[in-house]
Amino acid sequence: MAATYIRCAAERHFARESMGTLMQATLPDCREALLSRYAGTVQCVYLDPPFYTGKCFDMKARIGEKGYRTGSPALTLLAYDDRWESRESYLSLMRETLLLARELMKKEGTIFLHVDCRMHAHLRLLMDEIFGESGFLNEIIWSYQSGGRAKTYFPRKHDVILFYAKSRSYYFSLKSVPVARRETRSNHMKRGTDEDGRTYRSIMSGGREYRYYDDEPSYPDDVWDDVSHLQQRDPQRTGYDTQKPIRLLDRIIRCSTQEGDLVCDLFGGSGTTAVTAAQLGRRFLSVDKNPLSIAVTGKRLQQILGGAGCFDVEAPCGADDCEVEAEVYPAISSYTVRLLGFSSPAAREAGIDGLDAVDQWSAGFVQGETYRSCVSSARTADSPALKTTLEMPVCAGEPCIMLVDVWGSRRYYLPQRRY
């Protein structure tokens, strides 16, 4: 029943035209590949880089069915390291990232750079240098409520999103992001009702009456205080530190892109950019050096898109140091694939038993050096148990399985054939 380890150069989930790509790599390592494939094609770039905090940020990885049901057992794993030798080393990375982003963008493209008070001033000057002062569009204030108090200064409860265009022919649609009209406080405007029964407020200026109807759509300005920070028990939570809410990315992507456009995130993290883009019918490119980012994002995409969506994964294969038991039963028009056992040095060291170390897996076929996933199972809060039997149709290629462990490492195996 022992499965045979193999290496695959690429991975495609489901057999349709791809909606996007998840790429595990450092930006210096993948720069040339990105430019050769995507230069001049990206409509919107969103970057949520490290904030120069001097800290490490974690991901809480739940273990097995019990971990997903109760929150324990779980591992605390490194999401990203935000410690730097110097401010210059940080700004050097950001310069190279922004230069790369500019090359990837279309002439009509825009970029949103998410920062906080630590590097805001430095990055604003860097954005002016790379995109030109004329490329500046907005300094968006994202104001939110979160825990924590300060006694020696006012509490810091906002981030800044720097919004720039690559050229003056950029695309932007404010009408695509209407917001609920708020109850306005009493002011000097006069209340009225027109002949159709519509209520409004009016003001006279320069001998002319200006009416503001209560049922007219309202649009956000450059202070966004209507998008909540993710709370600890928010269903969106993946366990990834500094995760951003879908509502925030929804507004950014809607106003700056149209259906079918390509959205890029070079600090992919928990995958909110890719997930939101897919939900809105946009294509996506998400890059991160941490295998956990690719694992979390891929799982979120499968949850949201199911069999209706297709995406590619480009990530290094995990080491050939695991013991996997899997078997496949061929039939006339389908295959039954069973995952029976898993063991790895990391799992044994962490005291994790068997399949509890597997967070997600899929069954599909190897065609050349590409693994094509047909059906999958992943642990989630709503579905903590991992399916150990999957049914898939007969397709061209060798039956194969892909496993992602709790550390985010992905490996490919040929299951033992049973007749």
Can you describe what each PLM-predicted range is?
Residues Y38-A39, L125-E133, T276-R282, Q303:
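Short, surface-exposed basic-aromatic patches at helix termini and helix-loop junctions that form
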Residues M1-H13, M19, Q43, R124, ...:
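Accessory, often C-terminal, charged low-complexity segments
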Residues A79, W84-W142, A396-E398, M402-L414:
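Conserved Class I SAM-dependent methyltransferase catalytic core
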Residues M1-L100, R118:
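DnaQ-like (DEDDh/DEDDy) 3′-5′ exonuclease domain used for proofreading
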Residues A74-W84, V227-T238:
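Short glycine/proline-rich turn/loop motifs
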Residues G40-M59, M127, V263-A277, S286-V287, ...:
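Conserved proline-anchored active-site loop of SAM-dependent methyltransferases
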Residues T97, Q243-D265:
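Phosphate/ATP-binding catalytic cores across multiple sugar-kinase/actin-like superfamilies
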Residues S36-A39, E103-L104, I252-Q258:
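Glycine-rich helix-loop-beta junction characteristic of Rossmann-like nucleotide cofactor-binding loops
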